[in-house]
Amino acid sequence: MTTYNLRLKAKDELTPHPSVQYWRKCQVEELFAMPFMELVFKAAQVHREHFDPQAIQLSTLLSIKTGGCPEECEYCPQSARYDTGLEKQVMLDIEEIVEKAKIAKQRGASRFCMGAAWRGPKPKDIKVVSEIIGAVKALGLETCGTFGLLEDGMAEDLKQAGLDYYNHNLDTDPERYSKVVHTRSHDDRMDTLGKVRHAGLKVCCGGIVGMNETRPERAGLIASLANLDPQPESVPINQLIKVEGTPMAEAEDLDWTEFVRTIAVARITMPKSYVRLSAGRTAMSEAMQTLCFIAGANSIFYGEKLLTTCNPEEDADCLLMQKLDLYPLQYQEC
């Protein structure tokens, strides 16, 4: 087995590119501690240096294989170890997936993301998803896959099939990873990210907040993302959706200002990445989402469902974008 470990940048290992900055955890904590208005203003300035502030990238996420996952992640309703009422389902037929991708494109999405509840795919699974990727790509959509830990050669196969992005989140602060996920390590995640980069795929990598972590631990998550070299092209920031039956069902609610701070700090530390408002938007007011856009979020998951949980309806998102004069990016613009 070859290990392609995507290393976190160390201060004395930086490549000689002036745009690259190493972020100490304490520096990220200092950003979190800025006065709220100053932090949002700074993030908005950084955002405008690299993006059109009126542009937003729309992704649609579909679970192509739901439930029965052998992993033990305390936040996830798809784990077979928790009784959440979710029924295990076989993989969707390619015809059904393509039809949903067509609908997503018609409604304005430029990227179609597909997730499967595996610890990692088997070689036979890669053959199936490669066919699916090719069919979705032929529609004129960007493609993204989240299929778990990859073995040698799998990332290359996905790249050859036409996959654009591979999603593999770091979930939480590396120092508390084992407290949240019990069947894999942070190093396992880093190894797959290394394989993905080695294959020439773009990286979608973010995390989840609201899992009873402290602010310094949120800073640790952002620092671990910002110090990936190169930085992820796409950074999804999820607010925990508490699902009955999971250990995180009783997690304490995260104050909304702390979530906006997280978006702002992600924008400042990863200035050229797309920062996506991901899970948890159903609990966010329009005003809160607007502040997130001002603070540098420029992507959302668009569609009524995220894997197994609810998402705002398309009509509501379209209305909000109209109110804010936001326009969706097309595939070639992303």
Curated annotation (Swiss-Prot):
<comment type="pathway">
    <text>Cofactor biosynthesis; biotin biosynthesis; biotin from 7,8-diaminononanoate: step 2/2.</text>
</comment>
<protein>
    <recommendedName>
        <fullName>Biotin synthase</fullName>
        <ecNumber>2.8.1.6</ecNumber>
    </recommendedName>
</protein>
<keyword id="KW-0479">Metal-binding</keyword>
<feature type="binding site">
    <location>
        <position position="76"/>
    </location>
    <ligand>
        <name>[4Fe-4S] cluster</name>
    </ligand>
</feature>
<dbReference type="InterPro" id="IPR024177">
    <property type="entry name" value="Biotin_synthase"/>
</dbReference>
<keyword id="KW-0808">Transferase</keyword>
<dbReference type="GO" id="GO:0051537">
    <property type="term" value="F:2 iron, 2 sulfur cluster binding"/>
</dbReference>
<comment type="subunit">
    <text>Homodimer.</text>
</comment>
<keyword id="KW-0411">Iron-sulfur</keyword>
<dbReference type="InterPro" id="IPR002684">
    <property type="entry name" value="Biotin_synth/BioAB"/>
</dbReference>
<keyword id="KW-0093">Biotin biosynthesis</keyword>
<comment type="function">
    <text>Catalyzes the conversion of dethiobiotin (DTB) to biotin by the insertion of a sulfur atom into dethiobiotin via a radical-based mechanism.</text>
</comment>
<keyword id="KW-0001">2Fe-2S</keyword>
<keyword id="KW-0408">Iron</keyword>
<dbReference type="InterPro" id="IPR010722">
    <property type="entry name" value="BATS_dom"/>
</dbReference>
<keyword id="KW-0949">S-adenosyl-L-methionine</keyword>
<dbReference type="GO" id="GO:0051539">
    <property type="term" value="F:4 iron, 4 sulfur cluster binding"/>
</dbReference>
<dbReference type="Pfam" id="PF06968">
    <property type="entry name" value="BATS"/>
</dbReference>
<dbReference type="Pfam" id="PF04055">
    <property type="entry name" value="Radical_SAM"/>
</dbReference>
<keyword id="KW-0004">4Fe-4S</keyword>
<dbReference type="InterPro" id="IPR013785">
    <property type="entry name" value="Aldolase_TIM"/>
</dbReference>
<dbReference type="GO" id="GO:0005506">
    <property type="term" value="F:iron ion binding"/>
</dbReference>
<feature type="domain" description="Radical SAM core">
    <location>
        <begin position="54"/>
        <end position="281"/>
    </location>
</feature>
<comment type="similarity">
    <text>Belongs to the radical SAM superfamily. Biotin synthase family.</text>
</comment>
<feature type="binding site">
    <location>
        <position position="144"/>
    </location>
    <ligand>
        <name>[2Fe-2S] cluster</name>
    </ligand>
</feature>
<feature type="binding site">
    <location>
        <position position="113"/>
    </location>
    <ligand>
        <name>[2Fe-2S] cluster</name>
    </ligand>
</feature>
<feature type="binding site">
    <location>
        <position position="204"/>
    </location>
    <ligand>
        <name>[2Fe-2S] cluster</name>
    </ligand>
</feature>
<feature type="binding site">
    <location>
        <position position="69"/>
    </location>
    <ligand>
        <name>[4Fe-4S] cluster</name>
    </ligand>
</feature>
<feature type="binding site">
    <location>
        <position position="276"/>
    </location>
    <ligand>
        <name>[2Fe-2S] cluster</name>
    </ligand>
</feature>
<dbReference type="GO" id="GO:0009102">
    <property type="term" value="P:biotin biosynthetic process"/>
</dbReference>
<dbReference type="GO" id="GO:0004076">
    <property type="term" value="F:biotin synthase activity"/>
</dbReference>
<feature type="binding site">
    <location>
        <position position="73"/>
    </location>
    <ligand>
        <name>[4Fe-4S] cluster</name>
    </ligand>
</feature>
<dbReference type="InterPro" id="IPR007197">
    <property type="entry name" value="rSAM"/>
</dbReference>
<dbReference type="InterPro" id="IPR006638">
    <property type="entry name" value="Elp3/MiaA/NifB-like_rSAM"/>
</dbReference>
